Every structure is written in structure tokens, then in C-alpha cells.
Amino acid sequence: MALNNFSIVFPGQGSQYPGMLVQYIENLPLFKSTFDKSSDLLGTDLIRLLKQGSKEDLSKTEITQPLMLTSNIALWNQISSLVEKPICLAGHSVGEYAALVAADVLSFEDALSLVIERSRLMQAAVPMGEGGIAAIIGLEEININKICSKISQNPDYLVSAANLNSYNQIVISGTKEGINKAIQECKSSGAKRAIPLPMSVPAHCMLMKGAADKFSDSLDKAKFSEPKIPVILNVDSLLETNPERIRTKLIEQIYNPVRWLDTIKSMTEMKVTTIIECGPSKVLCGLIKRISSEIKTIDLDSFDNYLNLSNAERV
């Protein structure tokens, strides 16, 4: 039975893991060809990295971001001919670039070049070990914002909400000292958990403003077209059709929070009933289930799920 009222979402940094999607690479020539193209452009053998690289190797921002774009688009190329046109698309953080490729706003080659430069600038913006991120579970956004605002009065302790992921999960980003202080204060204020996360870059906070300003030059050189599929953007969780405004919002996205909760709310208002996560892992499916029990989720991390989707769409 064909899918109806569905959308597709693309995961970002944090969903990668060693050995991911290997069954796709070994069984689907079209899928493998996307990795081959990226490997040539990057000068790095991504397939070997997936098969032999460690978790730490895959967690380096300058590797992770192009790797996630490649993985997401390899899957999109595989399923786009199987399914009808989705109601809309969205991507989490760097996953937004995959959504824009799928919507024909950017070519894959331009998106890959942009993501490589984006990751380089973000990595260079804060010296290694001086920034951090943490997940706060079970504390309301208003309380987290108050805590972060208070701590950030000292510029050495800059910290703010970076990913508004669900009703009870918010990721904060900032200086290492700011993160450590925020973790303690969030716990004292009733957070169920406050966990530092292994990320080399404190994304989506004002520490990235300088990187965003430099990145604007690269975005100005890329060709942007009107989306052929509606895309909900991270910065404001709204649909955007104007190529120049999309370009501007990609700059803003680097130092502003990802509004994932509001993105899924927007999809429910558009009568989306099924969401396919087009990338490795099941992180976004997990978040979506916590936001709405009414939405069915399908992850493509499992090769069997892809085969089931493929067979169902041919019926």
C-alpha cells in the first residue's frame, strides 16, 4: 500500500556510527555510487572509514558533516523513485542540507562543498576542548533559558539552548565552563538528567557567529533554486520558498537553535501522519515519538525496513 500524507526528515551530527549502512553499500550499486562520488570530492575513502574507522574517527566534525550528507542523500536517491512526493522535508542541523538537495534547492556537489567548508569553519571557531554541549532531560525550556541567561552574564561562561528537540529534551551549547555550570544548575532545578555529549564543536550558539559570518561568502557563491518540495527550516520551523531567504537562514542556523519540536508540530498541522527518517540511526524517530504518538515513524537505518518499504510501494 502506497504511503499517504508522509514527510521525510534527515538526521544530523550524532547519528553516525561505525559500520552504519554497510548492507546498503554492499547490495545497492546506486547507493554505493553516492559514496564513491563523495569520496572523490573529499579525497577520503568514506566506505573504508565506515567499515574500519572508530567511533572517534567518525565523530570529528570535518568528517561527520560530509559523511552525514552523503549517507542521507545516498538513501534519498535510493527511495525517491519508490515513493510519491512527500508533503514536506526537514533536516536536523547539517541534515537540513540533505533536505535542500532532495528539494532541488542545491545540487549535491554544491551542498557537499558547503558542508565541508561549514564544518571546517565551525571546528576552527573554538579551540579544541574549550567548548561543549550537553543534553538536559526533564526540565522546561523556560527554566533552561533562565539558567543559561544567568550563567552567560559572565562571557567566559557563555551557554544557551542549541537543540529544542522535544518536550523533555533540550541540548545546550557553549564554553566548557558554561556547560559545566549549567549542568549543575539544571540538576539543582529538577532536571532528571544532564549529560555532557561527545561533540567536538559547540554548534548553534553565539560562539559560532564568527564562523557564520565567514560562511556567508561560500553561500553567496552557491546556486540556490526554488524548492520543488516544501522544506521546513531549523531557524524558525517555517516553510520557505524564497532561495535568498533560504540562503540567509542557513547562515543564521549556525548560531541559532534547531527548533525540532516546532518543526514536528508544523508537520502535524500539515496533516502529516507518517515520517520517514532518511539516514543512519533512529535518533529523529525517537524524538518524534516523544513529541506525537499520532505520527507513525519509519527508520531506514535497518536494511530490512528499506526492503519492506520497497516491496510495499510496488504493491
Which sequence ranges carry the predicted segments?
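Short amphipathic alpha-helices and their capping/turn segments at secondary-structure boundaries
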Residues: 1-2, 217
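Short hydrophobic/charged patches on amphipathic alpha-helices used for structural packing
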Residues: 261-265
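NAD(P)-dependent dehydrogenase/reductase Rossmann-like domain
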Residues: 178-179, 218, 271, 294-295, ...
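A short, flexible low-complexity segment enriched in Lys/Arg and Gly/Pro that occurs
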Residues: 67-73, 253-260
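Non-catalytic positions within long, well-ordered alpha-helices that form the structural scaffold/packing
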Residues: 187, 268-271
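FabD-like malonyl-/acyl-CoA
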Residues: 2-146, 274-307
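Short glycine-rich catalytic loops that host catalytic nucleophiles or stabilize transition states
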Residues: 197-200, 268, 301
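Alpha/beta catalytic cores of group-transfer enzymes, especially the acyltransferase/condensing modules
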Residues: 13-15, 42, 103-255
